[in-house]
């Protein structure tokens, strides 16, 4: 299915952009299921690769959606690509989103910043700098 195809692509991908429409102030059910399955089955292929997230809404709910999406890159040591504002656009239809000048500008910033970060990573690799090897962290429960 879609997730298995994504896992295969993730093996050779340099970076990721995860975006979703906003449904009831959260990521769409499809995106949530996709991300949960991708993280569980293919998380090791996400590790240390840059990620950008973005959300599109008619009106509101984008910040809670971004908060939901950011959890995945944070869990897998993925450098998070940012811009000068929260990565969101507004509109019910593609042509309406294009009228969101500020949101579209932030999306272009994400693209430029992603390209810059990928160049920095490649330059680092060429000079013997690799990502840290983090030891396995202890797993604890709140109730003992």
Task: Identify the residue ranges that each predicted region occupies.
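Glycine-rich phosphate/pyrophosphate-binding loop and the adjoining helix
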Residues: 2-5, 79-144
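Helix-loop-strand module that forms the ligand-binding subsite of alpha/beta enzymes
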Residues: 1-85
């Amino acid at each position: 299915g879609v997730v298995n195809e994504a896992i295969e692509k993730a093996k050779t991908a340099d970076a990721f952009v995860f975006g979703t429409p906003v449904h009831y102030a959260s990521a769409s059910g499809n995106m949530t299921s996709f991300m949960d399955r991708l993280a569980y089955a293919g998380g090791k292929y996400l590790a240390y690769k840059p990620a950008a997230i973005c959300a599109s809404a008619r009106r509101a709910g984008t910040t809670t959606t971004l908060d939901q999406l950011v959890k995945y890159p944070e869990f897998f040591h993925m450098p998070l690509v940012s811009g000068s504002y929260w990565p969101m656009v507004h509109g019910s239809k593609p042509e309406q989103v294009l009228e969101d000048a500020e949101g579209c500008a932030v999306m272009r910033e994400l693209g430029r910043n992603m390209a810059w970060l990928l160049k920095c990573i490649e330059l680092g690799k060429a000079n013997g700098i690799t990502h840290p090897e983090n030891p396995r962290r202890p797993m604890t429960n709140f109730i003992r």
